[in-house]
């Protein structure tokens, strides 16, 4: 059985206005992850991912590329332990 991994991923580049959040949420749901994704006012996209370690790592790899119109220039991952854990995967408002 895989260990549950919880991380916060911050993605910079051309990641807003290109469908990044919606595509991210679709991929996270397909991988059975819990968490959220949101735009930040500084132009980045931030996501909290929780789930089996192999699935979280696969999601992080996807986030390095993103959808076709995105251009990721930097991806930063930090441990995250956010409570309460959402029941599924949500697109949240900009912060």
UniProtKB/Swiss-Prot annotation:
Residue intervals of the Acylphosphatase-like domain: 6-93
Gene field: acyP2
Pfam families the UniProt entry points to: Acylphosphatase (PF00708)
InterPro entries to which the protein is assigned, alphabetical: Acylphosphatase, Acylphosphatase-like_dom, Acylphosphatase-like_dom_sf, Acylphosphatase_CS
Keywords, sorted A to Z: Hydrolase
Gene3D superfamilies reported in the protein's UniProt record: 3.30.70.100
Keyword set includes Glycosyltransferase: no
GO molecular function, one term: acylphosphatase activity
Active site positions, chain numbering: 21, 39
Catalytic activity: an acyl phosphate + H2O = a carboxylate + phosphate + H(+)
Record EC number: 3.6.1.7
PANTHER family: ACYLPHOSPHATASE
This protein's record includes keyword Ribonucleoprotein: no
Name this polypeptide is given: Acylphosphatase 2
The family this protein is said to belong to: Belongs to the acylphosphatase family.
EC top class, as a word: hydrolase
